[in-house]
């Protein structure tokens, strides 16, 4: 996983960043950008994503970290659009997308998840700068 992150920074100039709590520098998870490479009509777009350990959910850390990543992208890169997606069942992540100002585009079946799996159906959001 670490090597994939390093490779993406080297090839794309962006990747995932560690998220830590300010008070004690506890590692909480990550946020950042990722090149979308699986077979969908928005492939070759850039995804903004986040993943935090369960004990940090619901405390505002994900929107805070994602907002910082959005601001960096807007002010320090030439990237003009970001996507984000999650399973329809992951309402917490979808709320983060809404809180950071992303617009819902549509639903889609994730091509890497079997069609009968409950996590197959996803929701897609984007934001343009």
Model regions and ranges:
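Active-site rim helix/loop that mediates acceptor-substrate recognition in acyltransferases
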Residues: 1-13
